[in-house]
Amino acid sequence: MSVDIDTVKRVARLARIAVDEEDASRMTGELNAILGFVEQLNEVDVTGVEPMTSVIPTTMKMRVDEVTDGSKAEDIVANAPQTEEHFFLVPKVVE
């Protein structure tokens, strides 16, 4: 895949970034170099390689999944202007 100057300008416009002709031309080369590197990475055979999230083997700390009410209902609604039975009262928006 290669990027042309029109694609760079279109992406810049979508991202709301001001890019002049000189910058667009420079970015075209840079983006093509990046995409070339990604294509090289796609050629690497990773068959049998487990995906990893860290270079050091780690395990996530697990906790018991217990359903609770949080025991903080009073604290949560303490600063609300209007409440009823631990619920926020808000003005009706839709008729």
Curated annotation (Swiss-Prot):
Pfam families (alphabetical): GatC
GO molecular function, one term: glutaminyl-tRNA synthase (glutamine-hydrolyzing) activity
Highest taxon above the source species: Bacteria
InterPro entries named among the record's database cross-references: Asp/Glu-ADT_sf_sub_c, GatC
Reactions mediated catalytically: L-glutamyl-tRNA(Gln) + L-glutamine + ATP + H2O = L-glutaminyl-tRNA(Gln) + L-glutamate + ADP + phosphate + H(+); L-aspartyl-tRNA(Asn) + L-glutamine + ATP + H2O = L-asparaginyl-tRNA(Asn) + L-glutamate + ADP + phosphate + 2 H(+)
UniProt-listed GO biological process terms: glutaminyl-tRNAGln biosynthesis via transamidation; regulation of translational fidelity; translation
Keyword Protein biosynthesis: yes
Protein's UniProt keywords contain ATP-binding: yes
Keywords recorded for this protein, A-Z: ATP-binding, Ligase, Nucleotide-binding, Protein biosynthesis
Gene3D superfamilies, A to Z: Glu-tRNAGln amidotransferase C subunit, N-terminal domain
Enzyme Commission code: 6.3.5.-
Family per similarity comment: Belongs to the GatC family.
The protein's role, per its UniProt record: Allows the formation of correctly charged Asn-tRNA(Asn) or Gln-tRNA(Gln) through the transamidation of misacylated Asp-tRNA(Asn) or Glu-tRNA(Gln) in organisms which lack either or both of asparaginyl-tRNA or glutaminyl-tRNA synthetases. The reaction takes place in the presence of glutamine and ATP through an activated phospho-Asp-tRNA(Asn) or phospho-Glu-tRNA(Gln).
Subunit description: Heterotrimer of A, B and C subunits.
Designated name of the protein: Aspartyl/glutamyl-tRNA(Asn/Gln) amidotransferase subunit C
Annotated organism of origin: Chelativorans sp. (strain BNC1)
Gene from which this protein is expressed: gatC
